Regions:
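A hydrophobic alpha-helical transmembrane-helix feature that marks the membrane cores
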Residues: 1-233
Length: 233
């Protein structure tokens, strides 16, 4: 969502900054609830066999939804943007059901608590810091692309990079920093879209998606790190 090309004019804000942030975190929380509920339901029922046979299709479908929402949110209706976000959260829950099937409930609960702490600390930092974090964006994107390529190469040749402590540790740090960056970006988006009620609502949904992705990825890396530690012990 490129807010920099939007003509914001000089109209009065249609919602306060606090209302905007509250809506964003509310949508994010709803998305997480849908994902975790769907992951649990899938892992504990025969749906797990459906996911196993359609894993590639589900993965492609959820990536397509993210791409559509990210690239076309400015031209979509609020209802369509909301449906795309919740649809992605639902599909992602099915894809992530593997973790609920493999890892114990205690590991998942501890990982969720740790993720909430890490995410919360970085979100507070991104909200309160006076430092401009804009410069972090390109560097973090480069790190993310490097991790994706490394993980793909490792999977292709059976090196197992994706589950290593070093790889998971780097991934955890990258998404914690992205949380701070995305949180500050939310405030910048508000300053551009606050005068347009529809655009502000869509920006809130898009912001919820970015924070949702940060939270989910932090959670996954924490789960893997805990799994590695337990296997060694």
């Amino acid at each position: 969502m490129d807010y920099r090309n939007y003509d914001r004019g000089y109209a009065e804000p249609t919602m306060s900054a606090s209302d905007y942030m509250t809506r964003t975190y509310r949508w994010m929380a709803c998305g997480l609830l849908i994902t975790f509920a769907m992951a649990y339901l899938t892992a504990t029922t025969s749906l797990i066999y459906l996911v196993d046979s359609l894993y590639l299709v589900l993965t492609i479908a959820e990536l397509a939804l993210v791409f559509v929402l990210s690239s076309r949110v400015q031209t979509m209706s609020v209802g369509a943007a909301r449906a795309a976000f919740f649809g992605y959260a639902l599909l992602n829950g099915m894809v992530l059901s593997y973790y609920f099937f493999v890892f114990s409930a205690s590991t998942l609960v501890m990982a969720l608590l740790a993720t909430s702490l890490y995410f919360g600390l970085m979100a507070v930092y991104g909200t309160t810091t006076h430092k401009d974090l804009t410069g972090w964006g390109p560097r973090l994107m480069m790190a993310l692309v490097a991790m994706i390529i490394t993980g793909f190469v490792g999977m292709l040749f059976g090196f197992g990079f994706g589950g290593s402590v070093l790889y998971c540790g780097i991934g955890l740090v990258v998404f914690m920093l992205l949380t701070a960056y995305d949180t500050q970006k939310l405030q910048q988006m508000y300053s551009y879209y606050s005068a347009d009620a529809e655009m502000a609502e869509k920006a809130s949904i898009y912001g919820a998606l970015t924070l949702y992705l940060d939270f989910i990825n932090i959670f996954l890396y924490v789960v893997r790190l805990m799994g590695n530690n337990r296997r060694r012990s």
